[in-house]
């Protein structure tokens, strides 16, 4: 039984994940959506591709929402949700986790890595002065849903969480 578990785990998490083209969106698909690159490092010094999304018409955002993507897709799959958030007055910080799309890493490693990457993303947002004074919220889907719940043990100051189809 253990051998079967290892085989399944390696098949799921043992390689890089590139989002299929039919699941990707582009910023140009949305009006009033601006994207600014914001790269940061995670636990093994791997560079993660992060992006700040804003609506240029919003002068004083309600807060910053950090988006943690699910298994099988990078952050750009969530651009419709990100667009909705920005059009309702929020700044969004989204990123590709280790081994996903534009981020470094030979594989996505596993569920614990999703939590680790989110922890580093939260710390990046907390340390970046453009987010000073803004409440921090989390939005996670699937594997990202797992991460947004699990990371709360380390960040008691998170204002709100949306966990969509997560598993724990």
Language-model-detected regions and their locations in the chain:
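Primarily recognizes the serine-hydrolase "nucleophile elbow" in alpha/beta-hydrolase
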Residues: 124-128, 134-168
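Short beta-strand-to-loop junctions in surface cap/lid or active-site-entrance loops
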Residues: 50-60
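The serine-hydrolase catalytic nucleophile loop
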Residues: 71-84
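Short beta-strand element of the alpha/beta-hydrolase
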Residues: 61-70
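Alpha/beta-hydrolase active-site loop
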Residues: 108-129
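Conserved alpha/beta-hydrolase
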Residues: 82-104
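Alpha/beta-hydrolase
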Residues: 68, 95-97, 164
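An N-terminal hydrophobic leader/cap segment in hydrolases
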Residues: 1-41, 51
